[in-house]
Amino acid sequence: EAYVFGPGGGAEGDTNTKGGAGGYSVGTINTSAGGTLRIIVGGAGGPGSQSNGSGGGYSGVFTSSWQGNSPSTDHAAAIIVAGGGGGSADSSTNADGGGAGGYPNGQQGSPSGSGGGGGTQSQGGGYPGNGNGSCTATCTGTTLRGGTGCGGAEGSGGVGWPAQIYGGTWSSAAGGNGCNAGGGGAGYYGGGGGGGNPNGGNGGGGSGYIGGSGSYTVSNGAGYSGNFDVPATQATSSPYYTTGISRGGIHNINNGGNGVHSGGHGKVVLRYFA
C-alpha cells in the first residue's frame, strides 16, 4: 500500500499571501518478485528570486526507469503520484492564494481571471496570458513540471524538488515586466503559472495519478484534492500524516515546519504485505 502526500507551494515574502497545499494519493501497488521501485519525496516551494512563491515539487512511487534526467521517461514510469501546490503571487488582495495539488485535477490558483490552471490527467495547467505583464519563460504546465509565473527574473531558487532537476525555470515565481505571479506546482501534469490581470495571479496546483505503469498496476486507488493552503481532510486524518507536511506556505508563518513563507514537504509511506 502506498500513501503519497504532495508538497505545498511557497508564499510570497512581502505580503499576506498563501501557497497551495499538496495533493494526496493512495493505492495498493501490485509488484513482482525482484522488482525495484523508486520513491520520490517532493520538496516544498518557497519564495523565489522576486519574493513571490514558487511551486512545490511532486511526490510519488515510480518504476526503476525513473532517472531524474528525462521528463518523458520519468512520466511514463509513474505508478502513483501526488501533485504539489502552486506558489503565491505578490498581492495581498488574492487571499485564497496558490491552487492545491489534487486528483484528478489540480486546483486553479486565485483569482479566476489570472490564476494558473490546475494540471489534469492529460495536460498541464493553462497560463492565463492576460494583462499588462509578459511571460518570459514557459508558463504553461507540462509533464512533471509546473509553469513559470508571469514576469521576469525567474530562477530555480525556492522551487520544490524535483521540478528543477530537468533544467530551465519550471515552477518558478517571477516578477517585474508589469507582472508579479506565482509558479505552478509540479505533478503528473504540472499547474500553470499565474498571469497578470489582475496583477498577481497565483500558480495552479499539479495533478495526481493512480494509474500504474506497465506490470505495476494499482488497485483500490484514490486521489484527493486540497483547498488552497489546506490539505484534503483524507490527508490530515491519515494515520501517516505528520504535522506540517503538504501545507501551503503562509507569509511570515512557519505553516509547513520549514521556516516562514515555505510550504510543507511531501511524504511517502509504503506498507508491504508478503
Please provide the spans of the model-predicted regions.
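Acidic, glycine-rich loop-and-strand cores that form catalytic or ligand-binding grooves
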Residues: 77-80, 108-187, 191-206, 212-224
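Beta-rich globular "head" domains
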Residues: 1-10
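Short, structured beta-strand segments at or near domain termini in extracellular proteins/domains
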Residues: 59, 262-274
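Surface-exposed loop/turn motifs at beta-strand-loop junctions within extracellular Ig-like
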Residues: 6, 41-45, 274
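Secretome/extracellular-domain signature
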Residues: 13-145
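Contiguous ligand/interfacial binding patches
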Residues: 193, 199-261
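Extracellular interaction modules
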Residues: 74-76, 258-267
